[in-house]
Design a protein with these regions (language model features):
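Alpha-helical transmembrane segments and their helix-start/interface "positive-inside/aromatic belt" motifs
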Residues: 1, 5, 9-23, 94-112, ...
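Hydrophobic transmembrane alpha-helix segments characteristic of membrane transport
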Residues: 72-110, 203-217
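Alpha-helical transmembrane segments
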Residues: 208-225, 252-254, 284-285
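Juxtamembrane "helix exit" motif at the C-terminal ends of alpha-helical transmembrane segments
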Residues: 70, 74-86, 237-252
Length: 289
């Protein structure tokens, strides 16, 4: 009877140990690939990220938004002229410089609207340059490597009792699911930011048309701040990845494999949390809303 119990126990141990090793091996491959892809993704301009989407957004902006911006520009500058006249006692105190000022502001507004796309792309080109320089300075490997920790793991697991092994198997299964969730979160942050950039740039001529208006100018100014926030969000993401890379380098020295794995999970959750916060932080820095 004892022989059967021992055989059954060993069989369960082998099955649980095999399941644990299977769950842990390659667990971080998807997260590592996604983290490594962060620098590539955020270091690209809207045109380089997906040329087809870029061309579609450019066409929509030029064919639909620019005419609307022209109408808005005419309304804004007409209101501006009326206010300038009203402020000067209904033409009783009008000076010639007022008309020159209005003509200059109108010309500047037209110039801004006609060159909106170049201005917007210039913001992201500048942000790309900043990210490229930051990546060159940081240059850290952010891949999680637990191969050293798992080298002698299987013999140690076989020495454990059945109860703790069941607990470890459940933990390894849960950690594997968590890693896939983290992979999806990182994917959402990266692709969500790029889609937001395309959405914001598609309507660029409309807020830029109001840039020179006295009362409407806040629309254009806030739009520019939003562009800068989106651009420099990439720099904040690079900093997050750099901090994450420094943290994960110390994992290989951990002797307790489960502690090392849970530490990996904690660092990855922390990375996802900070990535989600970069958008609001960038907007707070540039006072965009």
């Amino acid at each position: 009877m004892d022989f059967l119990i021992d055989a059954l126990t060993n069989w369960l141990k082998e099955m649980l140990v095999g399941g644990i090793m299977s769950n842990l091996s390659g667990m971080f491959d998807s997260v590592n690939s996604q983290v490594a892809d962060i620098s590539v993704q955020i270091g690209q301009t809207p045109q380089g990220w997906n040329p087809d989407i870029f061309n579609m957004i450019h066409t929509l902006s030029e064919s639909i938004m620019v005419p609307i911006a022209g109408v808005l520009l005419a309304i804004v500058m007409t209101i501006e002229l009326i206010q300038m006249i009203a402020d000067r006692n209904n033409l009783h105190d009008v000076d010639t410089w007022m008309l020159f000022k209005w003509v200059f502001k109108s010309a500047a507004a037209i110039l801004i609207v006609t060159n909106t796309w170049s201005i917007v792309m210039g913001v992201f080109d500048m942000a790309q340059s900043v990210v490229a320089q930051a990546s060159g300075i940081i240059g850290s490997d952010a891949a999680i490597d637990i191969s050293q920790v798992m080298a002698d793991m299987e013999p140690r697991l076989m020495e454990m009792d059945l109860g703790p092994l069941i607990g470890l198997w459940v933990q390894s299964l849960f950690i594997g699911i968590t890693m896939w969730a983290m992979y999806i979160c990182i994917f959402i942050v990266l692709y969500g930011r790029m889609i937001e950039i395309y959405l914001v740039t598609s309507v660029a001529p409309v807020p830029m048309a109001a840039m020179m208006g006295k009362e409407w100018g806040g629309m254009g100014q806030n739009y520019l701040r939003s562009l800068l926030a989106l651009g420099f969000q990439a720099f904040l993401i690079i900093v997050c990845v750099a901090i994450y890379a420094v943290l994960v380098q110390n994992i290989a020295t951990e002797e307790d494999v489960i502690m090392a794995i849970w530490t990996c999970v904690g660092y990855t959750v922390l990375l996802c949390f900070t990535l989600f916060k970069t958008g609001s932080l960038a907007k707070a820095i540039f006072q965009a809303h």
